[in-house]
Amino acid sequence: MLEVRNLHAKIGDKEILRGINLTIKDGETHAIMGPNGSGKSTLSAVLVGNPLYEVTAGEVWFNGKNLLDMKPEDRAHEGLFLSFQYPVEIPGVSMTNFMKAAVNEKRKYQGLPELKAGEFIKLMREKQKIVELDNKLAGRSVNEGFSGGEKKRNEIFQMAMLEPTLSILDETDSGLDVDAMRIVAEGVNKLKTPETSCIVITHYDRLLEMIRPAVFTI
């Protein structure tokens, strides 16, 4: 699914990634651990196409396609998803409209018809149950006034809605209490299939005990 070969990347004049190699197969969950400044979040940013980072060497192949040649939105449409450590608030944009636009843009990219209003609401309610997302939260602006746990739960809800083939969870467990972490972990586990893979970036063992990745990279 994902093949990273000798990847080098920098921000400004500072090189952060120095020859990263990583192979992820269908159905695998990988845990990436390491101290602050080791490049964990930089790797996720480079994979999704954050323009602040410059790739200076190496290759990244995703499902047989050159990921580095793709625009960030095309990487998402191809099946890449990033759950942020600090999800941003988007005042004035309802969760329903935000997700409907995102889902239908991906369907359009795939050559599929847009979901009608009734079809979308049905899908949304099905996915809400997976992550135990309150219907009231789904009706509000994106992450506005959400607690830390609600924001992280909302990220997993977005993951459920978009059905990515490779999900990157960048310190999703940061700041969560045990109950919120359990709900997030259960959502991730329910979304696992033999065709989908996941990268879990973390400092802690707690989330890993709940998700149980097969491969550890330090």
Question: Which sequence ranges carry the predicted segments?
Answer:
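The feature captures the beta-strand-to-loop junction immediately N-terminal to the Walker
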Residues: 33-35
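ABC ATPase NBD Q-loop/coupling interface
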Residues: 59-75, 143
